[in-house]
Structure formats: C-alpha cells, structure tokens
C-alpha cells in the first residue's frame, strides 16, 4: 500500500549560486557523511548537490514530515545500486523509524541542462 508520494524540482543554477556564495559550508548542510566523497569527486558539484537536495525534499514530502526529524538532510542519503538505479540510504534513527512502521522508499531522479527532478514513493509493507 502506498504511504505517500513526493516530488521536487531544483534549478541547478540556483544551487551553483549558493555554492559560489557559501562554498563547502553549503554542501555540508545538504550532504550526509556517506555522500561527501562522491561530492568531492564530482565533475559537476552543483548538479550533484541539486540531485541530493531534490531527492531528500521528495523523501520528506512522501514521508509526510518534510525535511525534519527524523528525515533530516543528514539522515537521508542517495546512493546507487550496481546497475545505477538511485536508492535511499538512512542513518540509524531514520532506518529504525521506517522499519518500525514497515515503510520502504523508492526514488526516481532525472536531470536536464537546467533542472533536476526527484520523485519518491514510500510504501507500507
């Protein structure tokens, strides 16, 4: 059964302006610890951050909490499986919260020249 859906769109140039203005502090606000190496290695840091931010916003909307405890920006991370499919990873507290409620999340990400779009679906098992 579907618990919730969420979507978010982010303009990459807006993220670039924030990166230009605030540098590493801006990235640190958005990224979970597990995402920092990927960011450092990225050829397009603004696009990398835009994807993560959109995915986390979409997750919070699907969960119904917004980006707030337990679904903070640092508690949700984006990774990929061996075939490149995006997936969510969670900090310990959020993983427990989801497990207690029998919830699992799915993520779709797409990007074009100027925008990134994320769609999240959370289902109750």
UniProtKB/Swiss-Prot annotation:
Main location: cytoplasm
Subcellular location: Cytoplasm
Catalytic activity as recorded in UniProt: apo-[ACP] + CoA = holo-[ACP] + adenosine 3',5'-bisphosphate + H(+)
One annotated GO molecular function: magnesium ion binding
Keyword Transmembrane: no
GO cellular component: cytoplasm
Required cofactor names: Mg(2+)
Record-listed E.C. numbers: 2.7.8.7
Record InterPro entries: 4-PPantetheinyl_Trfase_dom (IPR008278), 4-PPantetheinyl_Trfase_dom_sf (IPR037143), ACPS (IPR002582), Ppantetheine-prot_Trfase_dom (IPR004568)
Leading EC class: transferase
Superkingdom of origin organism: Bacteria
Record keywords: Cytoplasm, Fatty acid biosynthesis, Fatty acid metabolism, Lipid biosynthesis, Lipid metabolism, Magnesium, Metal-binding, Transferase
GO biological process: fatty acid biosynthetic process
Name of a matching Pfam family: ACPS
Positions bound to Mg(2+): 8, 57
Family, as annotated: Belongs to the P-Pant transferase superfamily. AcpS family.
HAMAP family from the UniProt entry: AcpS
Function: Transfers the 4'-phosphopantetheine moiety from coenzyme A to a Ser of acyl-carrier-protein.
Name this polypeptide is given: Holo-[acyl-carrier-protein] synthase
Naturally occurring in which organism (per UniProt): Aromatoleum aromaticum (strain DSM 19018 / LMG 30748 / EbN1) (Azoarcus sp. (strain EbN1))
Gene from which this protein is expressed: acpS
């Amino acid at each position: 059964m579907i618990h919730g859906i969420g979507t978010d769109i982010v303009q990459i140039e807006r993220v670039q302006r924030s990166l230009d203005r605030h540098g590493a502090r801006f990235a640190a606000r958005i990224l979970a610890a597990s995402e920092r190496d990927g960011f450092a290695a990225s050829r397009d840091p603004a696009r990398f951050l835009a994807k993560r931010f959109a995915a986390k916003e979409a997750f919070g909307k699907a969960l119904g909490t917004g980006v707030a405890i337990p679904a903070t920006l640092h508690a949700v991370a984006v990774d990929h499986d061996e075939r490149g499919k995006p997936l969510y990873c969670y900090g310990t507290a959020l993983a427990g919260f989801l497990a207690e409620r029998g919830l699992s999340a799915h993520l779709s990400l797409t990007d074009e020249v100027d925008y990134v779009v994320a769609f999240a679906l959370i289902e109750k098992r």
